[in-house]
Amino acid sequence: MSTDSLPRSLMEQKAMELQQQLQALLDEIDQNKQESENISRESEYLCQYIGSMMAFQNRQTVPKK
């Protein structure tokens, strides 16, 4: 269907709906980005924690001469 045959009010309504959908998608992208950054920080912290625990465990298991 050509846009020439649509009434102006219907085209404006469609444009508004599309703009709202776009804004919702942009908001979701921002939220996902924030969650991803949080997960990255948590993963980094866990890796550091595990590394320090492994180092501590290795110190405990080294035989004394």
From Swiss-Prot:
UniProt KW Hydrolase keyword: no
Position of the signal peptide: none
Gene Ontology cellular component annotations, sorted alphabetically: cytoplasm
Any coiled-coil regions, as ranges: 8-44
Annotated InterPro entries: SCOC
Keyword field contains Zinc-finger: no
Keywords recorded for this protein, A-Z: Coiled coil
Pfam families (UniProt xref): DUF2205 (PF10224)
GO biological process: vesicle-mediated transport
Matching Gene3D superfamilies: 1.20.5.170
Family label: Belongs to the SLO1 family.
Protein name as it appears in the record: SCOCO-like protein 1
